[in-house]
Regions:
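Short beta-strand segments enriched in small/hydrophobic residues
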Residues: 1-28, 36-38, 146-149
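Signal peptide-proximal N-terminal region
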Residues: 15, 22-54, 171
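Soluble non-cytosolic domains of exported or imported proteins
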Residues: 19-30, 57, 61-64, 81-88, ...
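Short beta-strand elements in bilobed, periplasmic/extracellular small-molecule ligand-binding domains
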Residues: 41-59, 116-120, 167-193, 212
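Short, well-structured alpha-helical segments in soluble
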Residues: 57-76, 137, 190-209
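Extracytoplasmic ligand/sensor domains, especially the bilobed periplasmic-binding protein
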Residues: 75-179, 183-184
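Structural motif
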Residues: 79, 212-216
Length: 216
């Protein structure tokens, strides 16, 4: 029997444009449970069985204590669904112990570069990988002129850097970068609701010719 831990750090979620954009509470965990069932089905033939134990850490909670709890109960493999800074702290807290962490959520590029850790493996693609994949597809489709709507949050700017890098690598052309200063919900006027779709013609007015609008 191989016990596998799943440590999920809850983070404060922004307001969503639509209820359809709200993440399900078991996001990530549900995927691990499906994988567990699949592996245990074939595991009957290879005499391998896996169990999954989930530790959810509330916003501002002690993720290191939850990881230590899993380690003390014999979990040598722990899936970590947490922001990059939390992942690095967890890696340092468990250094030298027989525990291997799997990054299943953080997309930060530095985790595979200057902040690479020997006790962390990655299943989540980083932003550069995601941008490279998008760029290769767009160039293959001959959609090489890109209009970029950029946000103002650190995550937005990090993805924007990845898009710029991918454009240079694969031959895309960013015809314009335009900052989108919007709220995170549909209320944009004092008089009531205004659909985001209706804002796009105004937002893109006067832009150079482009094949694709990329949201960063």
């Amino acid at each position: 029997m191989v016990p596998v831990g799943y440590l999920k750090q809850e983070v404060k979620q922004p307001l969503h444009l639509s209820r359809l954009n709200v993440e399900p509470e078991d996001l990530g965990v549900a995927g691990a449970e499906i994988a567990l069932k699949d592996n245990n089905t074939t595991g009957r033939f290879t005499k391998q069985q896996f169990t999954l134990d989930v530790e959810k850490v509330p916003v501002g909670g002690d993720a290191a204590a939850s990881l230590q709890k899993l380690a003390d109960s014999g979990h040598h493999f722990v899936l970590v669904d947490a922001p990059a800074d939390t992942l690095l702290k967890l890696s340092d807290s468990i250094k030298g112990k027989d525990v291997l962490l799997f990054n299943v959520g953080a997309e930060d590029v530095n985790l595979r570069q200057e902040d690479c850790r020997a006790n962390v493996l990655h299943t989540a693609p980083d932003r550069d990988m995601l941008a490279d994949a998008l760029a290769q597809y767009l160039v293959w489709k001959k959609w090489q002129r890109w209009f970029v709507a950029k946000g103002v949050f650190p995550e937005d700017l990090a993805y924007l850097d990845a898009i710029r890098r991918a454009a240079k690598r694969f031959g895309g052309t960013i015809v314009e970068e335009r900052e989108y200063k919007g709220s995170l919900e549909a209320r944009r006027t004092d008089s009531g609701q205004q659909q985001i779709q209706q804002q796009m013609p105004v937002f893109t007015q006067g832009a150079p010719d482009y094949d694709v609008l990329i949201v960063a």
